């Protein structure tokens, strides 16, 4: 199996919980209908998945060509490149859906990115704790 059941559950639970949090928070904070923020969240999540596949394909190709090791510096460049590229695509989406200027969308998108970093840390910690309690031990190869 190309993608394990465990990875599918992890990815889907991560995205669904994040989508619910973002849709409700944006709807409440900006007084925008939940249908708008929910749709925006879904479109951004799908965009992120596709961008992830495209970006990583070309990044790994570049890595192989230049025989780069995954040092901290390379990982930081990867993260900045991924998030920066994603923001270039999502900022116009946010501006349109939320009926705001590009500058406001940049600020909102950056804020969302920072919140998602915190969410990712908390989600992963909780997920690992649950797996540990269920007796799952990850194999590292």
Curated annotation (Swiss-Prot):
General function of this protein: Mediates the efflux of short-chain diamines when energized by an electrochemical gradient. Involved in resistance to the synthetic biocide chlorhexidine, a widely used antiseptic and disinfectant in both hospital and community settings. Interacts directly with chlorhexidine and mediates its efflux via an energy-dependent mechanism.
Compartments where located: Cell inner membrane
Upregulating conditions: Induced by chlorhexidine.
Result of knocking out the encoding gene: Deletion mutant shows increased chlorhexidine susceptibility.
Keyword Ribosomal protein annotated: no
Cysteines engaged in disulfide bonds, as pairs: none
Membrane topology, as annotated: Multi-pass membrane protein
GO cellular component terms given for this protein: plasma membrane
Similarity-based family: Belongs to the proteobacterial antimicrobial compound efflux (PACE) (TC 2.A.117) family.
Pfam families in the record: BTP
Ranges that cross the membrane: 16-36, 39-59, 76-96, 103-123
Keywords: Antiport, Cell inner membrane, Cell membrane, Membrane, Stress response, Transmembrane, Transmembrane helix, Transport
Annotated protein name in UniProt: Short-chain diamines transporter
Species this protein is from: Acinetobacter baylyi (strain ATCC 33305 / BD413 / ADP1)
Top-level taxonomic group: Bacteria
Main location: membrane
GO molecular function: antiporter activity
